[in-house]
């Protein structure tokens, strides 16, 4: 019997044996070698856990989530084969999100809330800047910290909590410094930069560079659930000029016993971020270590293989990029077209529809699991029930509801993005040492 690579099982546990995947010379067969468990990570005392709570008043918007992901990484939809599909009426959607409660008082243990909005589109966290409170997005796919502030127009500020530098005792201007985050569909935030104290539930950086935009795009203005963004990527992504600044995570690392961020983002259940330590009660089995390539500033890992459902064969990617970014700021999974086509080939009546912007299917369809490789040694299993992201429309012929998939095409770009759909399936630790990711099944 042929040995199999180590795979996260149906309960998202890790199997007891760990193996390497290696390609035998001249053959398209996978052989296996035994691999020892990674060195255990020291459990720490100096740490901060940021608890999240579920936001019940969300508006599912799959196409909106895909558009946002394309915009973030500058992906121009092209090369996707869309069906005409006249038998489809999309739901109308209100892109203005429900305003999230600003109940953000941390308790004496340093635990604060984190609120998912719009069908878990964003995981938001209470943040204090210069003693003023905000709700912001923790984003491992970028490296700038910026906040809505008094320099914006009255229309832009409406519905947001606003940072006032004059009310902060610690604020100072970063002389002649500017930041400019620009996304693919002209979404942007730019302006001057200051230095202030940033605190996330007790995780405190006293001299953090904070962008104070003088202008932001409409998409940020309409997103009234969020007052800004905390970038947790590598410093290479930081946009401050003339001198790049360190990200919040880089600065915070010096104050932690271990430079780690653990993300437990489970679907429909309380989850958390935790800086500085790894809670063994949050995962099952052993953590396994995946090397990270941070040359582009992302938490990027090798990902060259996949399989769908009960297919016994592992497929090696033959077209497209062989790596993926682990990004808490993106909702969906954006993968090579080879993967997305193979996946929806196994979903009855699934098709790529222009009016929806991506793959849709009958909401009652049975969805297969998707397996993607992380590094050379492991497969992560994303259960099929995580692939039904949101209702998107109706069949005008049958009246049946149609749903939008949680995995979509990266449109042939040079990036695969593993967003929150993956994080709902597995427990992930971002480790600045190495750097590396450590992964396991959710407890």
UniProtKB/Swiss-Prot annotation:
Propeptide: 37-107
Keyword Signal: yes
Catalytic residues (UniProt): 139, 327
Keywords tagged on the record: Aspartyl protease, Disulfide bond, Glycoprotein, Hydrolase, Protease, Secreted, Signal, Virulence, Zymogen
Subcellular location: Secreted
GO biological process entries: proteolysis
Protein EC: 3.4.23.-
InterPro entries: Aspartic_peptidase_A1 (IPR001461), Aspartic_peptidase_AS (IPR001969), Aspergillopepsin-like_cat_dom (IPR034163), PEPTIDASE_A1 (IPR033121), Peptidase_aspartic_dom_sf (IPR021109)
Residue span, Peptidase A1 domain: 123-440
Main location: secreted
Pfam families: Asp (PF00026)
SS bonds (residue pairs): 363-403
Signal peptide: 1-36
Any one Gene Ontology molecular-function term assigned to this protein's record: aspartic-type endopeptidase activity
Gene3D superfamilies xref list: Acid Proteases
Residues annotated as glycosylated: 180, 293, 364, 388
Assembly: Monomer.
The protein's role, per its UniProt record: Secreted aspartic endopeptidase that allows assimilation of proteinaceous substrates. The scissile peptide bond is attacked by a nucleophilic water molecule activated by two aspartic residues in the active site. Shows a broad primary substrate specificity. Favors hydrophobic residues at the P1 and P1' positions.
Family: Belongs to the peptidase A1 family.
Protein name (record): Aspartic protease PEP3
């Amino acid at each position: 019997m042929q040995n199999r690579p180590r795979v996260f099982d149906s309960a998202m546990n890790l199997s007891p044996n760990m193996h390497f995947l290696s390609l035998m010379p001249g053959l398209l067969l996978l052989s296996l070698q035994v691999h020892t468990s990674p060195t255990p990570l020291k459990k720490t005392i100096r740490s901060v856990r940021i608890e999240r709570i579920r936001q019940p008043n969300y508006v599912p918007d799959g196409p909106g989530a895909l558009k946002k992901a394309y915009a973030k990484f500058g992906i121009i939809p092209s090369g996707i084969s869309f069906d005409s599909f006249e038998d489809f009426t999309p739901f109308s959607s209100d892109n203005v999100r429900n305003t999230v409660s600003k109940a953000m008082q941390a308790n004496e243990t340093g635990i604060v809330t984190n609120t998912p909005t719009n069908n878990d589109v964003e995981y938001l966290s209470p943040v204090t800047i210069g003693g003023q409170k905000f709700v912001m997005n923790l984003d491992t796919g970028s490296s700038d910290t910026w906040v809505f502030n008094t320099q914006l127009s009255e229309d832009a500020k409406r519905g947001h909590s606003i940072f006032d530098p004059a009310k902060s005792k610690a604020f100072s201007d970063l002389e002649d410094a500017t930041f400019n985050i620009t996304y693919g569909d002209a979404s942007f935030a730019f302006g001057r930069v200051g230095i202030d104290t940033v605190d996330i539930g007790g995780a405190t950086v006293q001299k953090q560079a904070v962008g104070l935009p003088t202008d932001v795009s409409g998409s940020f203005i309409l997103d009234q659930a969020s007052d800004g963004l905390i970038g947790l990527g590598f410093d290479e992504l930081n946009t401050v000029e003339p001198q790049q600044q360190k990200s919040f995570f880089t600065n915070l690392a010096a104050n932690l016993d271990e430079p780690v961020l653990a993300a437990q983002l489970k679907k429909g259940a309380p989850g958390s971020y935790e800086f500085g330590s790894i809670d063994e009660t949050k995962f099952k089995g052993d953590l396994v270590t995946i090397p990270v390539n941070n040359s582009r500033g992302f938490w990027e890992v090798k990902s060259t293989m996949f399989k769908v459902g009960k297919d016994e064969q592992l497929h090696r990617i033959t077209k497209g990029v062989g790596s993926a970014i682990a990004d808490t700021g993106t909702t969906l999974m954006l993968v090579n077209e080879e993967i997305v086509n193979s996946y929806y080939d196994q979903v009855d009546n699934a098709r790529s529809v222009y009016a929806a912007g991506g793959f849709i299917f009958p909401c009652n369809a049975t969805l297969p699991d998707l397996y993607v490789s992380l590094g050379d040694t492991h497969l992560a299993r994303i259960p099929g029930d995580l692939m039904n992201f949101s209702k998107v429309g109706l069949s005008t012929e049958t009246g049946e509801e149609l749903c939008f998939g949680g995995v979509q095409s990266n449109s042939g770009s040079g990036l695969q993005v593993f967003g929150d759909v993956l994080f709902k399936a597995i427990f992930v630790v971002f480790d600045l040492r190495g750097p590396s990711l450590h992964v396991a099944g959710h407890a």
